[in-house]
Structure formats: C-alpha cells, structure tokens
C-alpha cells in the first residue's frame, strides 16, 4: 500500500471513529458519567437536587455535541475519499487543523481532567496522526522525486 493510500485509509477510519463517537453522544451517552460527578466533587443526587433541570439540559448539550462530532466525521471521511487522495496543500492543511481542534483537543482535555476514557481517546487520535504523517512523507518523497 502506498503512503498516499495509507493516509487516505487512515483518515477515512478517523472519520468513521468520529461518526461513531457522535452517534454515541446522541443516542447512548448518559447526561453525566460517574467521572463527571467525581470531577465536580458532588454525587449525581446532589447535582440533581441542587440544579433540577441540569441533567435534561446537559443531555441536550451532549446531543448537539454528538451531532457536530458526527458531521465532522462525515466530512473527514468525505475528504479522505475525495480531495485528500491528491497531494494538494489545502486539503492537507484542513486535515491538520481540523484534527488538532477536534479529536486532538478532546484527547488533551480528557488527559487534563484525568478522564477514565483518556487512553481510548488518545487511541482515536492515531488514525489521524498516521494520515497526517503518511501524507507528509508521501508529499516530501514526491517533491524530492520531482527535483
């Protein structure tokens, strides 16, 4: 498999992962995880008692966040299947920036809050990282071959 193809497939996988995360946030994620209550230093019952409408509200917030994750993943997968196939600078720059501010920042934040899911999220960064590095190496080799 060529480096360009590896970059394309890895980016597509990263897009599918984001779509899966988005679906989880929309359909399966509870309003608060045990780690959320632990982080704020209160039990779920205390939070519910102190702010009765918080759980329904945050459930909607996570639903919206999940929709954005799914859309980001869909666009990432589309980019992998179309313009990322060619060694053009703009799609590569979009992939770098969008990966940094989406799954990259999510992984960093989960390490900052010592999330139970920090290692899983770091693993979800790997396809994006493979895509970026493979693309960069392929571009450098192509540039060197052209002289």
Show which residues each predicted segment covers.
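Hydrophobic, membrane-inserted alpha-helices
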Residues: 75-79, 100-109
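Hydrophobic transmembrane helix segments
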Residues: 16-62
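Juxtamembrane helix-break-helix junctions at the cytosolic face
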Residues: 73-91
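Short, Lys/Arg-enriched, Gly/Pro-containing loop segments at transmembrane-helix junctions
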Residues: 33-37, 142-147
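Membrane-helix boundary connector in multi-pass membrane proteins
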Residues: 104-123
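Membrane-water interface at the C-terminal end of transmembrane alpha helices
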Residues: 128-146
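Alpha-helical transmembrane segments and their helix-start/interface "positive-inside/aromatic belt" motifs
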Residues: 4-19
């Amino acid at each position: 498999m060529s480096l360009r193809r590896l970059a394309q497939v890895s980016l597509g996988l990263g897009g599918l992962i984001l779509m899966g995360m988005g679906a989880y946030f929309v359909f399966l994620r509870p309003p608060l995880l045990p780690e959320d209550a632990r982080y704020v230093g209160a039990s779920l019952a205390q939070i519910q008692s102190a702010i009765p409408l918080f759980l329904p509200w945050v459930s909607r917030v996570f639903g919206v966040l999940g929709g954005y994750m799914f859309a980001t993943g869909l666009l990432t997968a589309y980019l992998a299947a179309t313009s990322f196939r060619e060694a053009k600078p703009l799609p590569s720059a979009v992939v770098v920036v969008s990966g940094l501010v989406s799954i990259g920042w999510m992984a960093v934040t989960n390490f900052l809050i010592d999330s139970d899911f920090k290692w899983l999220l770091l693993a979800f960064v790997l396809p994006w990282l493979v895509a970026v590095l493979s693309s960069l190496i392929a571009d450098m080799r192509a540039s060197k071959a052209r002289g």
